[in-house]
């Protein structure tokens, strides 16, 4: 589940020199081209050929792996406790959010059919947005409660069909690497579906692409820390109310903040 074992730790990669502007621009343009091309293919396959997840899911993985390869990114996955996907159960993956590179990292590193709930603005990007919708990614308007509930309903339907839903409960990228207050939508989704929450700590993605700007620094070593699953079906009412605090502390630990 991991790529080549890194020669340096994620913390050591912080000391690497930044990639020069020309190389960074080349990586960015290559990534954009790959994104647009695979998005276009997905739109065509879904709308004209009625392609299903057996076609689209490997393509999502391919896209994620290519973006990491273009940036010469290596990563390793650590499991706090081994787990496997139980047929018939619903899963909500929750991670910290420091960079746009969180997206390809999670999609490449986590097994199974993973789809993201993302802010609506991403889905307005021409071609990419339509490609994500065709691939069953779920847009959410954080400023419109009614539409947000529709998005959660759509996510529920995907979960009922074996899709693992991933979201960053902070709602946006952290400007300083520290956890921001978690939004309630993901926890509502987990409680309503008796889902198993998988906390995931992402380390080092902000060194590849900082939260401000689009410069890409190549050659970084990242790590994904998968925490102990939390089965919401086994929690009491009081424990469910404490879930946001519990997951906040878990994500801080897994992401290396504490």
Where are these regions (language model features)?
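Non-catalytic C-terminal accessory region of glycerolipid acyltransferases
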Residues: 1-21, 149-258
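Membrane-anchoring hydrophobic helices of lipid-metabolizing enzymes
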Residues: 3-91
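Hydrophobic alpha-helical segments typical of transmembrane helices
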Residues: 55, 63, 102-105, 118, ...
């Amino acid at each position: 589940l991991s790529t080549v074992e890194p020669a340096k730790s994620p913390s050591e990669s912080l000391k690497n020199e930044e990639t020069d502007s020309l190389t960074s621009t080349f990586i960015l343009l290559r990534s954009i081209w790959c994104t647009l091309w695979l998005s276009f293919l997905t739109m065509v396959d879904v709308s004209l050929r009625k392609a299903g997840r057996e076609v689209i899911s490997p393509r999502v993985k391919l896209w994620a792996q290519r973006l990491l390869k273009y940036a010469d990114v290596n990563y390793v996955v650590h499991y706090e406790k081994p787990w496997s996907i139980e047929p018939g159960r619903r899963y909500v993956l929750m991670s910290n959010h420091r960079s746009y590179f969180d997206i390809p990292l999670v999609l490449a590193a986590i097994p199974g059919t993973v789809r993201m709930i993302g802010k609506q603005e991403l889905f307005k990007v021409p071609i990419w947005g339509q490609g994500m919708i065709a691939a069953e990614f779920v847009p959410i308007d954080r400023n419109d409660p009614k539409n947000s509930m529709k998005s959660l309903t759509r996510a529920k339907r995907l979960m009922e069909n074996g899709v693992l839903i991933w979201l960053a409960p902070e709602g946006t990228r952290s400007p300083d690497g520290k956890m921001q207050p978690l939004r309630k939508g993901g926890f509502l989704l987990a409680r309503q579906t008796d889902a198993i929450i998988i906390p995931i700590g992402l380390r080092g993605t902000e060194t590849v692409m900082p939260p401000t700007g689009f410069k890409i620094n190549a050659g970084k070593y990242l790590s994904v820390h998968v925490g102990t699953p939390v089965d919401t079906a086994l929690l009491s009412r009081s424990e469910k109310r404490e879930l946001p605090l519990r997951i906040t502390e878990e994500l801080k630990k897994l992401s290396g903040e504490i």
